[in-house]
Amino acid sequence: IQTKKEVSIKCTLRDLVSKRVTSPEDWMMLQPDSYIEMMAQPGGENLLKNTLEICTLTLARTKTAFELILEKANNTKLTNFDLANSRTCQIFRMHGWNWIKVCHAIACVLNRQGGKRNTVLFHGPASTGKSIIAQAIAQAVGNVGCYNAANVNFPFNDCTNKNLIWIEEAGNFGQQVNQFKAICSGQTIRIDQKGKGSKQIEPTPVIMTTNENITIVRIGCEERPEHTQPIRDRMLNIKLVCKLPGDFGLVDKEEWPLICAWLVKHGYESTMANYTHHWGKVPEWDENWAEPKIQEGVNSPGCKDLETQAASNPQSQDHVLTPLTPDVVDLALEPWSTPDTPIAETANQQSNQLGVTHKDVQASPTWSEIEADLRAIFTSEQLEEDFRDDLD
């Protein structure tokens, strides 16, 4: 037999999960009545905390970051959404990249389909758009844990039961390099939490921004090159070097949901099998994002031909020559309807109308003479013989 209190908590929990509530602030804004009701009960703070923890755990275990982003897409805006002119893709276009390929790779990582390459790394100089892209993705996911470098002993204290881990301005990993490598590769590990016991982190996508070369690990004064390649194997490397103008602005919160919906709509599923089908191979550390080139007009509104040069190579096209039919031959050899008028006479008539006289005008062949020459060269037998040679 369930008590009234149990029924109330279960109903509240279902509402919180359905509305994707992941923080006390979201709860206060979206469900203020249930928040006040629980807060007024004895032990209300612990009740709020435990209820919210169940909600975030449910989302982390049943949904991926990509799915949470996709849910927020506005289908009415998707019809006229221009992917190439979105702020995120404008940044990629500044570098001459295939912006569909980059977005597709990011979507695969967010959907936990990147395998060992479980981290999206935006790195490069300041003011190149690293943080605004990462912030837009994190806001679209909602259930995000942040790495706290200031908390030396418990830097991952906020990263349990999350759909995405955001590491802003990452620096030298130092003595935490092994923990970083485990989390960045999507392994299940246990971490220590302040005032609590250890807690398990399930495979969670990571998004990271930095101005430094994080592949160089220094512990004290000693450089540890053995960690360089393992770190590269865990990162989707996106190096941004083009500085943005001062009035570029932030990425709209609705942009990434529309990007994900656009990819799904046009057949770019967020799986590594689909990625290799479109782009030939899995992404690597030194991936060339500029290849293959995107055809002009690939994302113009209403454009249905979304094929890139990767899928339009000559080997994939089977061209079959059509035999030359008799009616085509007759049409080619049919007498022309143009009057039998010399070209020179026509030019003189036009010149006289304009008040201009031409001297020493060389006589040009008439249309009949040109037709006779062409008929002598391209006879019916010759056309059929040439076409038969092409077929052979």
Curated annotation (Swiss-Prot):
Cofactor(s) annotated in UniProt: Mg(2+)
Claim: Cell cycle is one of the keywords in the record: no
Keyword annotations of the record: ATP-binding, Covalent protein-DNA linkage, DNA replication, DNA-binding, Endonuclease, G1/S host cell cycle checkpoint dysregulation by virus, Helicase, Host G2/M cell cycle arrest by virus, Host nucleus, Host-virus interaction, Hydrolase, Magnesium, Metal-binding, Modulation of host cell apoptosis by virus, Modulation of host cell cycle by virus, Nuclease, Nucleotide-binding, Transcription, Transcription regulation, Viral DNA replication, Viral genome packaging, Viral release from host cell
Reaction catalysis annotation: ATP + H2O = ADP + phosphate + H(+)
Record note on modification: Phosphorylated.
Listed GO MF terms: ATP binding; ATP hydrolysis activity; DNA binding; endonuclease activity; helicase activity; metal ion binding
EC number: 3.1.21.-, 3.6.4.12
Top-rank taxon, per record: Viruses
GO BP annotation list: DNA replication; symbiont-mediated arrest of host cell cycle during G2/M transition; symbiont-mediated perturbation of host apoptosis; symbiont-mediated perturbation of host cell cycle G1/S transition checkpoint; viral DNA genome replication
Residues holding ATP: 124-131
Cofactor note: The endonuclease active site can probably bind other divalent cations.
SF3 helicase domain mapped to chain residues: 91-253
Compartments where found: Host nucleus
GO CC list: host cell nucleus
This protein's domain notes: In the N-terminus, the endonuclease region is involved in binding to the origin of replication. In the middle, there are the ATPase and helicase activities. The C-terminus probably contains a transactivation domain.
Subunit structure: Homooligomer; when bound to DNA.
Similarity comment: Belongs to the parvoviruses initiator protein NS1 family.
Role summary: Multifunctional protein which displays endonuclease and helicase activities required for initiating and directing viral DNA replication. Also plays a role in viral packaging and transactivation of several promoters. Binds site-specifically to 2-3 approximate tandem copies within the origins of replication (Ori), unwinds this hairpin region and nicks one DNA strand thereby initiating the rolling circle replication (RCR). Cooperatively binds Ori with host PIF and probably other host factors, which activate the nickase function of NS1.
Protein name: Initiator protein NS1
Taxon lineage: Viruses, Monodnaviria, Shotokuvirae, Cossaviricota, Quintoviricetes
Gene name of the encoded protein: NS1
